[in-house]
Curated annotation (Swiss-Prot):
The active site is at C113, H246, N276. Pathway: Lipid metabolism; fatty acid biosynthesis. Residues 247-251 are annotated as: ACP-binding. Keywords: Acyltransferase, Cytoplasm, Fatty acid biosynthesis, Fatty acid metabolism, Lipid biosynthesis, Lipid metabolism, Multifunctional enzyme, Transferase. This is Beta-ketoacyl-[acyl-carrier-protein] synthase III. CDD domains: KAS_III. GO terms for biological process: fatty acid biosynthetic process. Its EC number is 2.3.1.180. NCBIfam families: fabH, PRK09352.1. Coiled coil: none annotated. The last Arg residue of the ACP-binding site is essential for the weak association between ACP/AcpP and FabH. It is found in: Cytoplasm. Disulfide bonds: none annotated.
Length: 319
């Protein structure tokens, strides 16, 4: 049975940067207040008319180039997003068309900030089962369009961006284990319950979050799933080289690192400059650390994501 291994990574960030200082001109907040509570210093915003598929496509091109393959060899496209271009069809088919891959299976996965981990595990299962040999997995969001810019509790948190990986079959190593979980009992602590109905938008069109409840849930859930993911692969905390976590809040990241007994210089943190990009955050962070040389071939990585639903997931892999 083949492994699924990361052949290449890629990412894309929109040009517009919104700093905390600039944000403080819109709502009652300060740079110091935001940094002390979240670790975020700035975030990227998609331009007017720039869609999630535009970000996803650019990240995909960079991942394909890094993998050193022809796009035509890709046999599946999965896009994790909460902010699709439209209700339907999927954002994945838009990316598929732009890549010129007619006929290749393409679909979206919606698990909010855990979306990339769900898409990653799905692609891994297809490769492990021998159904395909290569998959393009993308996390892309324009979450800034779901934000109430008058609500300082949420407008400080989110940014736009996309990250992608190409997975390929490998006989020697790759993804060692994955774990996915969800608990709908906590669906109301982080949500955006808007929905189209008879030509109008019903429900609240903006993100709502109970910050303290989310923090409490996330810290325990991420610690627990890390233990399970390591155990499934016969590994321990001491074996880990890197943690690549969802970039939501620095205190959550630090709590996970402490649980894993990892120093922070072995944790990939892009939160200060990216903010929370939801499904894009894990592949964005991974690509940043691969491209700057921190993460090297053969190292053992733990990837983790968690978001509304509640849904969370992880993967242990040799890069």
């Amino acid at each position: 049975m083949p492994y699924a291994r990361i052949l290449g990574t890629g990412s894309y960030l929109p040009d517009t940067i919104l700093t905390n200082t600039e944000l403080a001109k819109r709502v009652e907040t300060t740079d110091e207040w935001i940094v002390s509570r979240t670790g975020i210093q700035e975030r990227r915003l998609a331009a007017e008319g720039q869609l999630t598929s535009d970000l996803a496509y650019r990240a995909a091109l960079r991942a394909i180039e890094a993998a050193g393959i022809e796009a035509a060899s890709i046999e599946m496209i999965i896009v994790a997003t909460t902010t699709p271009d439209m209700v339907f069809p999927s954002t994945a088919v838009v990316v598929q068309e732009r890549l010129g891959l007619a006929g290749v299976p393409a679909f979206d996965v919606q698990a909010v900030c855990a979306g990339f981990m769900y898409a990653f595990a799905t692609a891994n299962a297809f490769i492990r089962s021998g159904q395909i040999k290569r998959a393009l997995v993308i996390g892309a969001e324009t979450l800034s369009r779901l934000i109430d810019w008058d609500d300082r509790r949420t407008c400080i948190l989110f940014g736009d961006g996309a990250g992608a990986v190409v997975l390929g079959a490998d006989e020697d190593t790759g993804i060692l284990s994955t774990e996915l979980r969800a608990d709908g009992r906590y669906k109301d602590i982080l949500k955006c319950d808007a929905r189209p109905s008879q030509g109008v938008l019903a429900g609240n069109p903006f993100v709502y979050m109970d910050g303290q409840a989310v923090f409490k849930f996330a810290v325990k859930a991420l610690a627990d799933i890390a233990e399970v993911t390591l155990a499934k692969a016969g590994k321990t905390k001491a074996d880990l080289d890197w943690l690549v976590p969802h970039q939501a809040n620095l205190r959550i990241i630090e709590a996970t690192a402490r649980h894993l007994a990892l120093p922070m210089d072995k944790v990939v943190v892009t939160l200060p400059n990216h903010a929370n990009t939801s499904a894009a955050s894990v592949p964005l962070a991974l690509d940043a650390a691969v491209r700057d040389g921190r993460i090297r071939r053969g190292e053992l990585l733990l990837l983790e994501g968690i978001g509304g639903g509640f849904a969370w997931g992880s993967a242990l892999l040799h890069y």
